[in-house]
A protein has these predicted regions:
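ATP-binding N-lobe of GHMP and related small-molecule kinases
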Residues: 1-99, 117-126, 163, 170-175
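Residue-level signal for inorganic ion chemistry
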Residues: 15, 43-45, 70, 104, ...
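A generic local secondary-structure boundary/capping motif
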Residues: 32-34, 129, 139, 155-161
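Short, basic/glycine-rich phosphate-binding loops at helix/coil junctions
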Residues: 49-63, 111, 206-216
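Contiguous, small/hydrophobic- and glycine-enriched helical/loop subdomains that border
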Residues: 86, 108, 112-149
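Glycine/serine-rich anion-binding loops at beta->alpha junctions
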Residues: 90-119, 137, 244-259
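Conserved, helical-rich catalytic subdomain that frames metal- and/or nucleotide-binding sites
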Residues: 144, 149-245, 260-290
């Protein structure tokens, strides 16, 4: 079995993110509204007769073996399909790593879509999402993306009113934030503020993007330390540049702002790009039909 195809792997944003509590399996129950944007990696998948799944990437510091989630996704797919062919994955990365933008998860989801196209195995979107859940918590969402309410550890997906196409500026400071450490900090708090998830869904239903932007909220921002104070500074600069709202995505360290018009977004991006190498002007996109 041979063949090659290329799939885009879109970044995801968390319009809201709530941690409901720790689970007995080591994960946490989450509730979040997620949104895809056009910033993407390119994932080229080639079938061959080597019997080996491996990857290569334009980022030398990323793993290319079984530690790479895209490779794990290929292994899960082949096992489920009963196939023994080899898979070569070429990842052209644009999405920042350690940013809370789901780059690895989206790459894994793109591999699942590509393998379904190449093999014609006949898996449904739901089955691809189930495979994705074996690889990572965000992978099921990334299979089709769009505007979704995600619950459980991220695998329970409910469609909400799609967000219209809007300009977005993403800025990642030059430091990572430890995901396990953030969860530990949240778990240690006896009380916490909660995002208005219902309010965000209602704003989407009403098409009221300023109201949605004002309600964007990420509980992880409450447990950032002074060392991570640059997150708040970037948010302020986005808001000063005209963003309707700004918030950290996932466990960071990327921050994004939603804008009403492209000119304001471009201006804000230019200002931030003077100080940050990883700064992107992109836009929201809809859900894939699979």
């Amino acid at each position: 079995m041979t063949g090659t195809t290329t799939e885009p792997a879109w970044a995801k944003l968390n319009l809201s993110l709530d941690v409901l509590g720790a689970r007995s399996d080591g994960f946490h129950d989450l509730r979040m509204v997620m949104q895809s944007v056009d910033l993407h990696d390119d994932v080229t998948v080639t079938l061959d007769d080597t019997g080996v799944c491996r990857a290569e990437t334009n980022r030398s510091y990323l793993p290319c073996g079984a530690d790479n989630v895209a490779v794990r996704a290929a292994q899960v797919f082949l096992s489920r399909a009963g196939l023994t062919c080899g898979v070569h994955i070429r990842l052209h990365k644009r999405i920042p790593v350690c940013a809370g933008l789901g780059g690895g998860s989206s790459d894994a989801a793109a591999v699942l879509r590509a393998l379904e196209r190449l093999t014609g195995a006949g898996f449904t979107r739901t089955q691809l999402e189930e495979m994705g859940a074996q690889v990572g918590s965000d992978v099921p969402y990334c299979v089709a993306g769009g505007t979704m309410l995600a619950e459980g550890r991220g695998e329970r997906l409910t469609p909400v009113t799609p967000m219209p196409r809007m300009p977005v500026v993403i800025c990642k400071p030059d430091f990572p934030i430890s995901t396990p450490e953030l969860f530990h900090r949240v778990d240690a708090r006896t009380s916490r503020c909660r995002p208005d998830t219902e309010g965000i869904c209602a704003a989407l239903a009403d098409g009221d993007m300023p109201r949605l932007a004002r309600r964007m909220y990420n509980v992880f921002e409450d447990v950032l330390t002074h060392r991570e104070g640059e997150i708040a500074a970037i948010k302020s600069r986005l808001l000063d540049g005209g963003a309707l709202g700004a918030v950290m995505s996932g466990t960071g360290s990327a921050v994004f702002g939603i804008f009403a018009d492209a000119d304001s977004a471009a201006y804000a991006k230019r200002r931030l790009a003077r100080d940050y190498a990883e700064c992107f002007l992109t836009e929201t996109i809809g859900r894939l039909e699979i």
